[in-house]
From Swiss-Prot:
Its main location: membrane. GO terms for biological process: cell adhesion. This is Probable GPI-anchored adhesin-like protein PGA28. It is found in: Cell membrane. It comes from Candida albicans (strain SC5314 / ATCC MYA-2876). Putative adhesin which is involved in cell adhesion and virulence. Plays a role in Candida-bacterial interactions and subsequent regulation of filamentation.
Amino acid sequence: MKFFAYFAVIALSSASLINLFKRATANGCEVESCYKAHQTLINSCNGAFDFNCLCNLPQSYFQNLYDCSKSCDTLQESDIHSPSDIRSIYCEAASNSIYTFSIDSISLDMIGYSDFETDTEATTGSDTRTKAATGATTSAGTGVTKTSETGGVSSTANSEAKSGSVTTSKSGSTSISESKTTSGSSSSGKSSSSTSSASSQQTSSHAGGASGAFVSLLGLFAALLI
């Protein structure tokens, strides 16, 4: 109940007390006690809602505040039954015996964007980075160069060069080399010449199998001689 009483006292202080005074006449409140409590708050605490200042206010302030709130029925369903109860709550709040908090103590800088990154955003970013890395690796590994052909009345020159080599080894060796050169030029029409050459060389060796076959042939030749 003291928790609800604490908020009831807050409603009677500072700006809320001014609103209470404004509707005092319409609600049949005790106008004089509301006015006196408000004046004490302005003169002693400069209108600020400071628990330390409120705790040290004279007893007359709490009496007027209690009478004002009681006549306006603002202390219903609370355990405030006397002016001393109001003072006690203010003083407990001043000594931090009652839990209080300030919005200013919450810093938005403590929260980072990565904490809220959705799974979709994280997956998309990862896929993008993976595709970029894969594309760079593929281009470097295959050595493929895209070229464009040009032709027409005002074309002057066009050339294309492509070379590559592949080496495969599996119980042997295979090497393939290819070169291609294309050149062309035109002034009023289109002409082109191309020269390509390809050579492939494949060498396979099976040391173990060849040696065994050679021994078998020698044995067969000896048998025929006998």
